[in-house]
Amino acid sequence: MHEYALLLLSTALVNNVVLVKFLGLCPAMGVSKSMDAALGMGLATTFVITLAAAASWMLEHWLLAPFDLGFLRILSFILVIAAAVQFTEMAIRKMSPALYQSLGIYLPLITTNCAVLGVALLNVQQGYGFFKSVLFGFGSALGFTLVLLIFAGLRERLALASVPAAFAGAPAAFITISLLSLAFMGLSGLVAT
């Protein structure tokens, strides 16, 4: 049990996919202008990453590795991710049309979010079993959502502040996410590798 909690904590905080591995920066910058959109995108991405981690583990261990089809890994993982995103998009459109509208183009772009593919490929590289792979995907997705929410909150506060014209918009966002990355770097001693 301790091992699972440690894996979840380390993937969410210490080895964060956005701030340590630099995966998923595009949606982090694009959807983080409001807390509602960031929460919706974070939850949708959490579902997709967790589902993709489970599906890619099964695909790798039941089809690709036994038949020596490793050269099809990236292509097959992208197809699995696209199917998971389509399922998520249909569910969000049906359950919450307002959230579907607020996410806009970023919802179908989860398919091309490098964090989703990166987590699936890292799962294969780490060699985890099924449960640990799903937990790794879920922890990575929680870390992505956490960064998205913190960054959205900081950007909302920054929008109310008087920022010099030279730093308004993207420069302030990049400075903010770099400071957030430094804050998360302080957690690096939390889990021994």
Curated annotation (Swiss-Prot):
It is found in: Cell inner membrane. The gene is rnfA. The chain crosses the membrane at residues 5-25, 39-59, 62-82, 102-122, 134-154, 172-192. GO terms for biological process: electron transport chain. This is Ion-translocating oxidoreductase complex subunit A. Keywords: Cell inner membrane, Cell membrane, Electron transport, Membrane, Translocase, Transmembrane, Transmembrane helix, Transport. Part of a membrane-bound complex that couples electron transfer with translocation of ions across the membrane. It comes from the Bacteria. Disulfide bonds: none annotated. It is a multi-pass membrane protein. Its EC number is 7.-.-.-. The keyword Electron transport applies. InterPro entries: Ion_transpt_RnfA/RsxA, NqrDE/RnfAE, NqrDE/RnfAE_oxidrdctase. Belongs to the NqrDE/RnfAE family. The complex is composed of six subunits: RnfA, RnfB, RnfC, RnfD, RnfE and RnfG. The keyword Electron transport applies. Pfam families: Rnf-Nqr. The lineage of its organism: Bacteria, Pseudomonadati, Pseudomonadota, Betaproteobacteria, Rhodocyclales. GO terms for cellular component: plasma membrane.
